[in-house]
Amino acid sequence: MFNEIPVFDYEDIQLIPNKCIITSRSQADTSVTLGKYQFKLPVIPANMQTIIDETIAEQLAKEGYFYIMHRFDEDSRKPFIKRMHEQGLIASISVGVKAYEYEFVTSLKEDTPEFITIDIAHGHANSVIDMIKHIKTELPETFVIAGNVGTPEAVRELENAGADATKVGIGPGKVCITKVKTGFGTGGWQLAALRWCAKAARKPIIADGGIRTHGDIAKSIRFGASMVMIGSLFAGHIESPGKTVEVNGETFKEYYGSASAYQKGEHKNVEGKKILLPTKGHLSDTLTEMQQDLQSSISYAGGKDLDSLRHVDYVIVKNSIWNGDSI
């Protein structure tokens, strides 16, 4: 059965334009609803230590963007929730599946976050299903995102356990080497995996990994994503938490994967690597450019909002859209 599924990735696809019905791209609405909340863009900076910290999370929330705080500074999570709520902002945190996380979730009853993401590399697991059920029992009002997965069966199981959204993508990210270290994953066919999973989903899908250009956001939405999690495009900003490094007079920011030796502090179960990215200005500028590009995508789709992207035709062009060009 699997061999009947078309296999392609972002660079293999071109969306086909429709007649434009707006007079300016500023008329295109890029907002998206997740749970009870509306956000300015359908993008989420990856919940990684070199992408997001508490300061950036606060900035994003204040400006109407969705965020997910990483889980690698465990003791700061409760104070973070409290601080966000004191400012009237949503709290969106990550948890793992180890035994102590159950007690932590139960302790959140007195100050409940609006969103919890269960964040492990291989999310189609009994440990994730058990954690979903625990969160839904203890914090029934919290919106639960679970992942990461790469098959329709996994999406259905996590949804049936109570997940409100699932995160799709096993190792397609720029600093993820799961596909090389394990032989498994959605690297090289992430967009096809997204399409496959979205057809089975009854709840929102978050595409996670493999996004290299702003046009890939529109393609993700076309193939079933409600939101798109992005790492490398959000790394390397002046505000980014990654360490700043100078090489031959140029400044770079460190960017590493969530299961890398640099994050774990040891060479154990390593599925991520570290790279240096040229420093690229302010995060707010990237968000503005993303919004403008997505508004242009909507205008090409012949609509006024994100839903128009879901209905456009496409062609599979097998690695030829760059035609020798680079960006």
Swiss-Prot record:
Catalyzed reactions: IMP + NH4(+) + NADP(+) = GMP + NADPH + 2 H(+)
Enzyme Commission designation: 1.7.1.7
Assigned keywords, A-Z: NADP, Oxidoreductase
GO annotation (BP), single: purine nucleotide metabolic process
Keyword Oxidoreductase: yes
Top class in the EC scheme: oxidoreductase
Binding-site positions, NADP(+): 205-228
Gene Ontology cellular component terms for the protein in this record: cytosol; GMP reductase complex
Active site per the UniProt annotation: C176 (thioimidate intermediate)
CDD domains referenced in this protein's UniProt entry, alphabetically: IMPDH (cd00381)
Keyword Membrane appears in the UniProt entry: no
GO molecular function, one term: GMP reductase activity
SMART domains, per database record: IMPDH
PANTHER family per UniProt: GMP REDUCTASE
Family: Belongs to the IMPDH/GMPR family. GuaC type 2 subfamily.
Reported function: Catalyzes the irreversible NADPH-dependent deamination of GMP to IMP. It functions in the conversion of nucleobase, nucleoside and nucleotide derivatives of G to A nucleotides, and in maintaining the intracellular balance of A and G nucleotides.
Name of the protein this chain belongs to: GMP reductase
Organism listed in the record: Streptococcus pyogenes serotype M18 (strain MGAS8232)
Name of the gene this protein is made from: guaC
